C-alpha cells in the first residue's frame, strides 16, 4: 500500500504537486502555474506558465487570481518540460489533491511525462473515506475540497487556489492523515465495505 511505503520513504523522495489552469478541459484549456515541493516542504519548482493560445480566462481568474498580466512573460509549458520531467522521474512518491484525476492527466496532455515509477497518493481520494459523507446516489464517499481537508486538520492560514500554497496545504494534510490512526483505520474499514 502506498501509505505504508510512504511512511518509510525519505522525505527528499516525496514530492507534492499542484497546478492552476485556465479551465477543467485538459485537451483545450491550458496550465497557468505549476508548483512542486519535496516532503520537507522545500520548493523544487514554482512558476507561472504562459499559455500557448489563450489570453483570457475570466471564470477561473476569479478563483485563482491569475491574470494574463501574471503570465505574459512566463515560460511556456514545453520550455519547462525538462525541469518538471526530471523532478517527477526522481520521485518515489507523488502526492497531490485530486492529482490522479486532474493535475497528472492535465500535465500529460500538455506533454509532461507523468508515466513515472513513483507511487501516487491522492489526498483527496483518501480523505473522502475519513470525511464520512456518503453519497447514496453515486454509491461512494463525496470528495471534499482542499480547504475542507485543511480546515479539518487545523491548517487554515493559507491562500487557496495558488499552486504553491495548495501544495503546502496538501503536504500538511498528508502528514496529518498519516498521524491520524483512528481516521485511517476507519477509512480502511469504509473502503472495504464500499468495495464489497
Which residues make up each language-model segment?
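Short alpha-helix plus adjacent loop in nuclease-associated cores
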Residues: 121-141
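Acidic two-metal-ion nuclease catalytic site recognized across multiple nuclease folds
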Residues: 1-8, 151-152, 164, 168-196
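P-loop/Walker A phosphate-binding loop and immediately adjacent motor/lid segment at beta-alpha junctions
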Residues: 114-119, 182-184
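Conserved non-catalytic scaffold segment of RNase H-like nuclease domains
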Residues: 2-111, 115-117, 143-155, 161
Amino acid at each position: 500500500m502506498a501509505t505504508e511505503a510512504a511512511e518509510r520513504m525519505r522525505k527528499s523522495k516525496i514530492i507534492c504537486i499542484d497546478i492552476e489552469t485556465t479551465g477543467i478541459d485538459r485537451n483545450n484549456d491550458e496550465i497557468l502555474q505549476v508548483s512542486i515541493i519535496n516532503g520537507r516542504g522545500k520548493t523544487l519548482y514554482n512558476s507561472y506558465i504562459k499559455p500557448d493560445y489563450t489570453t483570457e480566462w475570466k471564470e477561473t481568474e476569479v478563483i485563482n487570481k491569475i491574470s494574463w498580466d501574471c503570465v505574459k512573460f512566463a515560460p511556456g509549458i514545453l520550455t519547462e518540460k525538462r525541469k518538471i520531467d526530471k523532478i517527477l522521474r526522481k520521485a518515489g512518491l507523488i502526492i497531490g489533491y485530486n492529482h490522479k484525476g486532474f493535475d497528472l492527466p492535465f500535465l500529460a496532455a500538455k506533454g509532461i511525462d507523468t508515466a513515472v515509477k513513483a507511487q501516487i497518493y491522492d489526498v483527496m481520494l483518501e480523505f473522502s473515506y475519513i470525511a464520512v459523507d456518503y453519497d447514496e446516489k453515486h454509491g461512494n464517499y463525496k470528495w471534499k475540497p482542499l480547504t475542507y481537508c485543511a480546515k479539518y486538520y487545523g491548517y487554515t492560514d493559507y491562500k487557496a487556489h495558488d499552486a504553491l500554497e495548495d501544495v503546502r496545504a496538501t503536504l500538511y494534510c498528508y502528514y496529518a492523515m498519516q498521524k491520524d490512526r483512528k481516521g485511517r483505520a476507519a477509512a480502511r474499514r469504509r473502503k472495504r465495505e464500499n468495495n464489497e
